[in-house]
Amino acid sequence: MRIAVIQFPGTNCEHETLVAVRECGMDGEIFRWNRPEQELCEFDGYVIPGGFSYQDRVRAGVIASKEPVMATLREEAANGKPIIGICNGFQILVESGILPFGDGVRLALAQNVMIRGGEIVRRGYYCAWTMLRHDAEEKRCSGSYILRRGEILSIPIAHAEGNLVASDRKVIERLIEDDQIVFRYCSPQGEIINEFPVNVNGSTENIAGISNPEGNVLGMMPHPERAFFAWQLPRKHPRIPGYGPGRKIFDSMKRYIEERRS
């Protein structure tokens, strides 16, 4: 089971993402953006990791979205192969039009705007541990394949532009109706509170992650590779054995591929 971890200039999370892929028993490989894109077809799945591709120039993800490798990823997505875009990877998937519907750019991941009590308390880059509620049906999405609806995960964010917005409210309504909202920022009890610090970036409907209509492509702003091992979790004595909740994202991809093959 071969997984390509796509590396663009400025990507900075490829190595820890590769560790997560391999720890789950998949054969991971860093795939540079300037390799012959036809070689991508040899892989069973793909992860576009976080970082700041092309230094986020113009806007986050837009330059990487124009690279030839993304046209090939679009074709592989149409063939049903799983893709997970994390943070900048999510931004690239949105800018390329693969998410949300595969028919062009319908969303934007705008600058973070933190609102509390009706007032803007902060803008821009924010790094913190967040709580996510899994809002999709079980097996609806390749990147959350093993999660139950309503399951709560603690996974960190680190971004300046994760505020998911749409100029047309019908786009958001379609995401809701088609069960494409995979993760939403929530309280520790699972409540959806549209206010900072629960909604960490001002995202519409507290959206933290979405899928395409077919469910094989997931884009999410939080970083599961940073919550993969238990020692990464925020505790007084962090070096404990075992795994954190982020592992479930990568295990989901593996299970999705296995069941798709059978």
From Swiss-Prot:
Keywords: ATP-binding, Cytoplasm, Glutamine amidotransferase, Hydrolase, Ligase, Nucleotide-binding, Purine biosynthesis. Pathway: Purine metabolism; IMP biosynthesis via de novo pathway; 5-amino-1-(5-phospho-D-ribosyl)imidazole from N(2)-formyl-N(1)-(5-phospho-D-ribosyl)glycinamide: step 1/2. Residues 2-238 form the Glutamine amidotransferase type-1 domain. It catalyses: N(2)-formyl-N(1)-(5-phospho-beta-D-ribosyl)glycinamide + L-glutamine + ATP + H2O = 2-formamido-N(1)-(5-O-phospho-beta-D-ribosyl)acetamidine + L-glutamate + ADP + phosphate + H(+); L-glutamine + H2O = L-glutamate + NH4(+). GO terms for cellular component: cytoplasm. Its main location: cytoplasm. Its EC number is 6.3.5.3, 3.5.1.2. SUPFAM superfamilies: Class I glutamine amidotransferase-like (SSF52317). It holds the Pfam family GATase_5. Part of the FGAM synthase complex composed of 1 PurL, 1 PurQ and 2 PurS subunits. Part of the phosphoribosylformylglycinamidine synthase complex involved in the purines biosynthetic pathway. Catalyzes the ATP-dependent conversion of formylglycinamide ribonucleotide (FGAR) and glutamine to yield formylglycinamidine ribonucleotide (FGAM) and glutamate. The FGAM synthase complex is composed of three subunits. PurQ produces an ammonia molecule by converting glutamine to glutamate. PurL transfers the ammonia molecule to FGAR to form FGAM in an ATP-dependent manner. This is Phosphoribosylformylglycinamidine synthase subunit PurQ. The gene is purQ.
